[in-house]
Amino acid sequence: MCYEWNLDKNKTNLEKHGISLEEACQIFENDVFTWTDERKDYKETRKVSIGSLGDEIIIVVVHTDRNGITRIISARPTNKTERKLYNEHIKKTP
């Protein structure tokens, strides 16, 4: 997979959430739980994925696909509800 992100957004995300957008790409190397974000019209299809960075850190990554490239929009630690969703999904995945 190819990834891209806005460099200014990467800096802001790292300062705010302690996770770089480059680091966030790692979740796609393992099982992820993904759904389409339909909360509002973003003028593009945005997806939300929950996955792990290593064995213990579970994060949420917002992304979109543009011409075959996954553009990372944001990344942050999960909240309690998101961790539960992720764990339930992973247990169901063979």
Regions found by a protein language model. Give the residues of each.
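Ribonuclease/tRNase effector modules and their secretory precursors
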Residues: 1-94
